[in-house]
A protein has these predicted regions:
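N-terminal structural segment of carbohydrate-active enzymes
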Residues: 25-70, 82
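Positively charged n-region of N-terminal signal peptides that target proteins for export
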Residues: 1-8
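Aromatic-rich peripheral "rim/lid" segments of glycoside hydrolase catalytic domains that contact
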Residues: 26-28, 77, 143, 157-164, ...
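Substrate-binding cleft and catalytic face of glycoside hydrolase catalytic domains
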Residues: 30, 60-81, 86-238, 308, ...
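Sec-dependent signal peptide cleavage junction
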Residues: 17-24
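Short, electropositive alpha-helical surface patch
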Residues: 124-143, 148, 238-255, 326-341, ...
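Bacterial N-terminal signal peptides
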Residues: 8-16
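Glycoside hydrolase catalytic-domain groove-lining segments
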Residues: 94-95, 106, 204-234, 239-323, ...
Length: 399
């Protein structure tokens, strides 16, 4: 009996040392967030559809997903399908994206459509005559027609195949430049002309109104479908005042661009996606700074004052120093406390919080993912066990 008791004691001790699995031990985060008016979102890649442990975690705690790359134009556009068409419009391959949205639908999870128009990594052949990279760039009207066709067909495809699942679209991503070398002098919108020295092909060949036109095409598609799909502008550093001011100027230009039959401005843009990478890029300096919480709050309210919804779309609370784990957990608690109080006091302008840095990363130092999300930036570790930051978020929402 003594041996059995000793064995049982050891087993109990071992069990106590095993980290708790979030989906087994805790109420869903999205259930706790619902009374405060916002969804809880997670990223999903096509490869993760084969990771059942990750899928279980997402199902347990999140009621919104964002496909990381698979709904972007460079993923959907297909040259073979394009050249097979007889109308001269672009063709798409929805295979990977459809599987991901199907999974979301099967599990009662909404999808943020990300993204219809983004200059980064955009396929060059989309802008060329006859879609041939060896030929000159096509004229402006051709690019407008292609973009309208692309946006209309993509929005229509997902709404008709998965009604109501894609509840919002990032129509345009990161169109605001960061430095005066990236936008024209005197442009209050800071509309991006260059990205890392390369021209913004949408602005170059579609024109300075390409953002407003993209929203117009998307709004027309949504209204034709009779869908309740919200249309967002999405950008990083959207809580820094200078960039936020330019974003507001851009959205104001979008929402005064087109008029209805009565001459009233059509609100083409419904909301702002604040990506939410918080802290230094690749370095600990600038991470876990309490003043950032107030800055985020202030800009959410500034966007809301324009009649816009807000979502935190790609949040990563960066941490490059493992010894700062407790401080980071406390920072996460302050952040969610602010979200809850802000919505309670201001009519729920914040509609979703999507966490991009969901897990830690083992990407090598200096790697893009290392810099973007940080090695210790997750709510969960590399094995998907909960971290103190998750517990703090949970306790804050549950109070």
């Amino acid at each position: 009996m003594k041996k059995i008791a000793a064995v049982l004691s050891v087993l109990a001790l071992l069990c106590a040392c095993v980290p708790a699995m979030a989906e087994e031990t805790y109420e869903p985060l999205y259930t706790l967030a619902a009374p405060y008016g916002f969804k809880m979102g997670a990223p999903l890649s096509f490869d993760q559809l084969r990771n059942q442990k990750y899928l279980n975690l997402v199902k347990a705690h999140f009621n919104s997903i964002t496909t990381t790359n698979e709904m972007k134009a460079y993923s959907l556009l297909n040259l073979q399908a394009t050249k097979a068409r007889t109308d001269g419009m672009p063709g798409m391959n929805y295979s990977a994206a459809d599987q991901m949205v199907q999974w979301a639908q099967d599990n009662g999870i909404g999808v943020r459509g990300h993204v219809l128009v983004w200059d980064a990594y955009m396929t060059d052949w989309f802008f060329r005559e006859d879609y041939d990279s060896k030929k000159p760039y096509a004229d402006q009207e051709t690019i407008k027609a292609r973009t309208e066709s692309y946006i209309t067909e993509v929005v229509t495809h997902f709404e008709e195949k998965f009604p109501g699942v894609v509840y919002c679209w990032d129509v345009v991503n990161e169109a605001v430049g960061d430095s005066d070398s990236e936008y024209a002098a005197g442009d209050a919108r800071h509309l991006r002309t260059l990205r890392s020295g390369s021209p913004n092909l949408f602005r170059e060949y579609m024109g300075e109104d390409y953002v407003a036109l993209a929203f117009l095409y998307a709004k027309n598609a949504v209204e034709a479908l009779g869908a309740d799909t919200k249309l967002y502008y999405n950008d990083y550093n959207a809580y820094f005042s200078d960039k936020a001011q330019a974003i507001r100027a851009l959205i104001d230009s979008v929402n005064t661009f087109a008029q209805d039959e009565n001459g009233n401005n059509r609100q083409l843009c419904d909301g702002v996606g604040m990506q939410g990478y918080i802290g230094g890029y690749g370095v600990q300096e600038g991470c876990l700074v309490d003043s950032h919480v107030g800055m985020i709050r202030d800009e959410i309210l500034n966007y809301a004052a324009m009649g816009l919804e807000v979502q935190i779309t790609e949040m990563a609370v960066r941490n490059f120093d493992l010894t700062q784990a407790d401080k980071r957990a406390a920072f996460y608690a302050k952040l969610f406390q602010m979200f809850m109080e802000l919505n309670g006091e201001n009519g729920n302008p914040l509609k979703a919080v999507s966490i991009w840095g969901l897990t830690d990363t083992n990407a090598p130092k200096g790697n893009y993912v290392y810099n973007l999300n940080s090695p210790y930036g997750g709510l969960f570790d590399l094995k998907l066990n909960i971290k103190d930051a998750f517990v703090k978020v949970y306790e804050t929402l549950k109070q």
